[in-house]
Amino acid sequence: MFLGDHWIGMEPFMEEFQTIGLDAVVGSVGNGATLRLISDIEGVRYTEGRFLPYFFPDTFHEGGDPTREAKVNWVTARRAILRKPIDRIGYGGYLKLATQFPDFIDYVESVCKEFRELYENIKGTTPYCVKRVAILNCWGKMRAWGNHMVHHAIYYKQNYSYAGIIEALSGAPFDVKFISFDDIRNHPDLLDSFDVVLNVGDAYTAYTGGDNWKDEAILTAVRRFVYRGGGFIGVGEPASCQWQGHFFQLADILGVEEETGYTLNVDKYNWQDHAHFITEDSGDAIDFGEGKKNIFALESATVLRQIDKGVQLAVNTFGQGRGVYISGLPYSFANSRLLYRAILWAASAEGKIHRWFSTNYNVEVHALSLIHI
């Protein structure tokens, strides 16, 4: 099956998918998240990634630079391969067009050699995982890696600030699982299996959960998890719905709230930026993408970045646990490092920062492990 433009009804992460007797899944690889969307599928003999660029005239024309596009595609996908490899790679299109670019053909040869070397060393092994991370939304595992994805790795103004989180995680040294609100209802102790929970997206969407945050069982489970030492990272408008005087239902964990008009007459004083472990590699400028306006910090929070009195990054403590708020985080090497630090801080694991670590955030270190550390 080619997992591409149309695959409704063939949800590859549902348990029923493994019963249909499919031999293999092939899909277009636009970035790390799309690679994991393919490589994490279970119950097939092999998975294959169709790398970019396709041999089509939009790239293979006079003055075009298919080699550059191929390099960006490979470097982006490679970090995800090191976490969970596909079994085969390939390219597609009109071969006649590719033959007109000998540099491109030479580069593809080098990619194939590198892939074989990586595959021989990592297939069947367990990658080093510094912490266990859960992405909480309405779909859970059914849309693993495909949430915030409309078309393979295509930019959309409305969601690139959130898709960057999933992209960063696709090649990061974490054991990543996707869970739903129903999973928590059915298994109240489920969160004990994780170190950090993320909720990412806009309000009143399946990404963040909408009215699920009115459910006492959900609120109790998440608050108990954090209070006992877990971490919660909210991106965009996390845990949000207007209810009982709050918009962010976990404002007490995140330390921030969104002004929706009900607290305009409440003075807000917490606007000072502070240095922090999370931003040590970030420099003065952080790319929050579209970001968010009208987010203000509660007195207990520590603001790390604000723009025009709109909080973009803040941290807070809740019992023995910690909360982190991020307004948005498009994928980049720098932002991938920021998210890595944010997860470690949320998990109270700053001391593990230098395990398999590069001080240059443009370089990522991948290691193999037989157990989670």
Question: Where in this protein do the model-derived segments appear?
Answer:
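Hydrophobic targeting/anchoring helices
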Residues: 1-159, 244, 262-273, 277-291, ...
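Active-site proximal loops enriched in glycine and acidic residues that flank catalytic Cys/His/Asp
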Residues: 26-29, 51-53, 93, 137, ...
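Extracellular/periplasmic catalytic domains that process cell-envelope and extracellular macromolecules
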Residues: 126-129, 190-192, 227, 317-318
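Helical hinge/lid and interdomain linker segments adjacent to catalytic or ligand-binding clefts
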Residues: 154-249
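Conserved beta-strand segments of alpha/beta enzyme cores
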Residues: 175-177, 302, 322
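A glycine-rich, often tryptophan-bearing local segment used as a flexible ligand/cofactor-contacting loop or short
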Residues: 209-284, 289-291, 305
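Short, hydrophobic/aromatic-rich segments at coil-to-beta transitions
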Residues: 298-304
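Conserved small/polar residues in nucleotide/adenosyl-binding loops
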Residues: 371-373
